[in-house]
Amino acid sequence: MSERKWNVESSIKKMNSVLDAIKEKISHEAYEYVMKAIVSGDAGRGDVIYQFITYGFTLGAKVVMAVQFQEVADMFTLVRSVQNEAYRYIEVLRFKEVIHKPPLLLSVIEPKHDIVAHLANHFADRFNSEWFIIYDARHHKAVFHEAGGKWEVRLLSENEEQRLKELNETEEEYS
């Protein structure tokens, strides 16, 4: 049996329309499941999310409890995998002070899932008055946190990644 490959054009407007429909016609909890599953590193996540949404429009808010359906159970597994990895990183992530004046903290991670934004909220609260960067080397992204609480996630250029790798070669650990 051969697999078909599809070329799908993405549209921000259509994406937002679908996400709004999930919140309004299924539930906010189903929306949160979808948002967590989107960042999964699983190659089949698109099909799992699609099947979950399809069941959601049929079952409504009860879809998040309908794990008797394999498609919903698969979604639950994806979400749990993303959450577990985020929690593990929250527990073990350590920063190095790579610049002293002003102090800049850096942590380099390589998670399976694209969880750097999930980590940002936790560490923004914990290190609110610090400048820090959480660099996800696998997904070529980083969280940049300014002292005082403002943060952003960005895709990095090759030059930015090289600079972060150079900064990471310093020694002091700060946790």
Residue ranges and their predicted role:
Residues 1-175:
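Extended, well-folded catalytic/binding cores that form a central cleft or groove in large enzyme
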